[in-house]
Regions:
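N-terminal secretory signal peptides
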Residues: 1-40
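Surface-exposed flexible segments
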Residues: 22-35, 230-238, 352-353
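Solvent-exposed N-terminal domain segments of exported/luminal and surface proteins
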Residues: 41-242
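Extended beta-strand-rich segments in extracellular/periplasmic secretory proteins, especially
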Residues: 112, 119-120, 189-209, 217, ...
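Hydrophobic beta-strand positions
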Residues: 123, 175, 245-248, 343, ...
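Short, flexible loop/turn elements at secondary-structure junctions
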Residues: 220-224, 249, 253, 262, ...
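Short, mixed charged/polar active-site loops
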Residues: 226-228, 255, 352
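Acidic, serine/threonine- and glycine-rich low-complexity intrinsically disordered segments
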Residues: 232, 237-311
């Protein structure tokens, strides 16, 4: 007979205790980040129930299973409310894969190295911006691996969206209507270049741009009536400031400045991607306010095994919805610990939320 050291509800009680006491360090059985620094392995920080979907659901869901309307109730508490509706009412399916326990697979190497190297060197200044202990702009990696509050946690997302100094994405966008039919289709490019908090070999700052955080641009290449439409988003390091937003509209053949506080409106007709959506941190973090940590829990997340490869032109198979093309095939895994943060768009009177 095997006697379990930690019963099934041990982690639930641990998360409730963290919320009650305000403790923010990641890890249930022990601190997470020292384990990552030593070997990258997270398994000693969490009990089995948080590392195995089979253990968590007591065998009802296994790695390789599809989450459908028939079994979604077993993982309802691991999904956000919208994803639950997608699966339970709209035919979405989610493939379950094994939990990633090697943290080095979750970050670019230089970014993880900078996070470990710069631990303890970040603070929030009087305005709420992230600075070093010398008062300079941040120098790379997560500034707060073990955040003490919601704002510190959110700064980890905001200062480096994709964890790379620069990134380029080629995107094909399909906008599906409530009836399940394709309403709009776009091809566009999305590019990011950080100017501070850099982790490359040339130092943490781009010379001459230390007052900025990043340049971000998007330009459309299809269809022809939108081809050439482009936008440049210039972020200031001071997160109280709105970015400068400039755009080129082919129909007018000129560059114009757009009101940057209207970040909840589509860039082109029908598209449901907004500037505010980027990396779940698409606005300067101090243009939002009232940050609160409202939960600590495991969740299902799209972390690994979602590479489709060139055989399908990098396009995912689709399913669900009224016409079988509303949702893309997605793999998710049990993420042992997530921080749930609530914030309000205090700087946006026209925000729809």
């Amino acid at each position: 007979m095997r006697i379990r050291k930690y019963d099934f509800n041990y982690s639930r009680r641990a998360f409730l205790d963290k919320m009650a006491t305000g403790a923010m360090a990641a890890g249930v059985l022990g601190p997470l980040w020292p384990l990552i620094a030593r070997a990258g392995d997270i398994t000693k920080a969490y009990p089995e129930e948080l590392l195995s979907i089979e253990a968590y659901t007591k065998g009802k869901i296994k790695t390789g299973d599809l989450i459908t309307a028939d079994n979604v109730e077993f993982v309802k508490d691991l999904l956000d409310p919208v994803a639950y509706v997608h699966v339970s009412q709209m035919g979405r399916q989610i493939r379950i894969v094994k939990t990633t326990t090697d943290a080095t697979r979750l970050f670019p190497k230089k970014y993880l190295d900078a996070t470990l190297r710069n631990q303890g060197k970040a603070q929030l200044d009087a305005d709420g911006n992230v600075v070093t202990t010398e008062g300079k702009p941040w120098i790379g990696g997560n500034p707060f691996p073990d955040p003490r509050d919601g704002l510190q946690a959110f700064s980890n997302l905001t200062l480096s969206w994709g964890r790379h100094d620069n990134s380029f994405y080629a995107v094909r966008d399909w906008d599906i209507g409530p009836d399940g039919d394709l309403q709009y289709e776009y091809d566009f490019c999305w590019a990011e270049q950080n100017t501070t908090a850099l982790v490359g070999d040339n130092g943490p700052y781009m010379p001459g741009h230390e007052d900025k955080l990043r340049f971000q641009s998007v330009w459309f290449t299809y269809p022809n009536d939108s081809k050439g439409t482009s936008f440049l988003n210039t972020w200031y390091y001071d997160q109280r400031k709105f970015p400068d937003l400039q755009g080129y509209l082919p129909a007018f053949k000129r560059v114009r400045r757009f009101p940057t506080n209207q970040r909840f409106e589509p860039l082109v007709p029908g598209i449901t991607l907004f500037l505010s959506d980027a990396w779940a941190a698409g606005d300067p973090m101090l243009t939002w306010g009232n940050y609160k940590v409202i939960g600590r829990q495991p969740m299902l997340g799209a972390v690994s095994e979602n590479w489709m490869g060139p055989g399908t032109n990098y396009e995912r198979p689709v399913h669900g919805g009224a016409k079988g093309k509303t949702f893309m095939e997605t793999a998710m895994e049990l993420v042992p610990e997530t921080i749930v943060i609530e914030a309000e768009p205090t700087g946006y009177p026209r925000a729809p939320v």
